[in-house]
Amino acid sequence: MDELYFYDCNLNIKSFAGMLENPTQCYKFFWLDSIMQLVARGENEFTFLEVFAGMIADAWYAVKEYHLRLGPKSVDGTSSNLLERAVNKISENVDVKNDESRDIIIEKIKCNSKCVNSEMQDLAKNVPYRLLSSFVKELGGNNPLWSKTGKLISYFEMINKKRCLLYTIENGRGLTKKVVINKLWNNFLIDNMVTIRGWIKMKKIKYLQDRNPGVPGLIYKLEPEKDKERKLENVRKLWDCVIDINGVGFKDIYSK
């Protein structure tokens, strides 16, 4: 049955689907979605800084406008989530609106990356590597190799020659390390962009709802709603036409 999980040229879709399983924090969702948005722009190589800036920008509205919890609290009651801390640090040092566009927020983060350097460095220790754990199950979650990023990068390179990993990591200093998307996976990501991003969003919402149980309509609190999507003019026109064609017989059950 395992062969059913291969898309093209030994792309293991089962391993891909396993990337977002059993999260202890929300970072996997934001990391993968940030990568997807870069791929959608035609990029297949990008620095850790670029991906992290996208992650922080994607968390911005939920944290600033609705104060959603992105992860568990620390013992003292403060947030232990690095994305929450990064959003709050940037907002304390830079003038950015709660509903600012994603592209502008990303540029602000890049220009002021020093003030969230510690958060991004902490993210860089595990997130880029652990996302690939479903592709390298032979390592096991407690394998000491996970804490040795240099050797881990070399290991990924070796494994990628035997079976296609989603990406490999090009070594460098700190946040200049690069994510390099496998060309075969790149085609898969582009072909299935809408489906994959919808799947990531579903997983993200489930995780966040568990940490914000009293928040209704959480799906609408992750990003600003575009005005054009809120306009009901076309809907009204449609129902005006339906009423004209059918005449009487429609009853308003809401206002009467």
Name each region found by the language model.
Residues 1-255:
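Mixed-charge, low-complexity interaction segments
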